[in-house]
């Protein structure tokens, strides 16, 4: 689909009249030590948890500097036929697993794909959890329970209390 002057996931969804959760966006980082690119594909309504991504990669990252030389077109990056100059890593967030009919970048300036089916179009994708947790979201461990986020009253003290309070408040650490 020709999408002139559209660069953000919000703009593309408005242009195509689709909700954010039916889109696949790319977030690009670089590894601190090597400057190799890391391209993260995640559902359009979610954000990347950089701590989870750093833990998965085993090294620190920073937001990428995208230039024409690297082969990426900011605002038009997609998982189909992705090519990046040099060494790079592609990460697919678990939120995309089993999804279809998504919109995404076509890796060509001013163009986007519609109808992306992850299992058909990216059959060998390996999915990991790198999304930020949302209040009311689905549990990334079991996929069933919804998550409730509450404000804490104290952060910074460490006590050897075991599970005394977490059990009494029916809380679970993910």
Give the residues covered by each predicted segment.
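Extended, low-hydrophobicity, polar/charged segments
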Residues: 1-174
């Amino acid at each position: 689909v020709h999408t002139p002057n559209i660069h953000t996931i919000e703009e593309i969804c408005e242009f195509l009249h689709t909700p954010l959760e039916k889109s696949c966006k790319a977030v690009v980082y670089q590894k601190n030590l090597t400057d190799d690119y890391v391209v993260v594909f995640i559902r359009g309504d979610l954000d990347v948890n950089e701590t989870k991504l750093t833990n998965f990669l085993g090294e620190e990252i920073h937001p990428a500097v995208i230039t024409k030389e690297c082969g990426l077109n900011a605002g038009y990056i997609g998982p189909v036929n992705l090519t990046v100059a040099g060494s790079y890593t592609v990460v697919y967030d678990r939120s995309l697993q089993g999804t279809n009919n998504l919109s995404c970048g076509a890796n060509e300036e001013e163009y986007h794909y519609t109808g992306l089916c992850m299992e058909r179009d990216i059959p060998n994708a390996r999915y990991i959890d790198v999304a930020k947790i949302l209040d009311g979201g689905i549990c990334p461990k079991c996929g069933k329970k919804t998550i409730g986020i509450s404000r804490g009253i104290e952060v910074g003290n460490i006590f050897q209390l075991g599970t005394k309070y977490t059990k009494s408040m029916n809380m679970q650490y993910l």
